[in-house]
């Protein structure tokens, strides 16, 4: 219980990350811009190509993701660092244990994303002359679903990578993948297939119908669940004693 409370407390570190970009503008005054546009730009960034404005999660806007990785990148893999054979000898069902850890990680991601996006939306409201409307809340909930899935998916990959390679290589591999997908997203702004498959690309998502957006979100969570299931199967067959052999 103490560990869970401590982890919840650590998530509060994202509030300065969410609010800091708006502080300088708050000291100057409000601007004539929609809350929706400011919110999308604050969270995702904006890439413009010709007459078409498309969105990808630009690298400079990934501080919230990096912070979550630093906080929870060893949430599961940390159990393998100190006498893992003794620790896991007391756990009869490895799959159930791993599934619970994934669920707890999901809960932290849900709370963390709410803090980050809530802080960002508050900052946008503080610097905009306009008020949030129906479209603002639509964008908020879409972004919220996306952020939770990305936090869970990438953090699970990092934890599994650290378990497999016994080092922080998993962290590096995950972030190399993120950067590569960012590059692909920018290089294929007008390709709907790549935009759909690539978890880091959201080209035209705000112009999609509810059904199309729902499919995209379901796809992202399918990836996260797939990684979780793979981790459960892998962990069930994993030889814990290998962790204690240098």
Walk through the language-model features, giving the residues of each.
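Membrane-interface helix-boundary motifs at transmembrane edges
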Residues: 3-4, 95-96, 160-169, 236-241
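Central hydrophobic cores of alpha-helical transmembrane segments
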Residues: 13-18, 166-182, 223, 244-246
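Helix-loop-helix units of permease transmembrane domains in multi-pass membrane transporters
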Residues: 75-107
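Juxtamembrane non-transmembrane "cap" segments at the membrane-aqueous interface
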Residues: 178-197
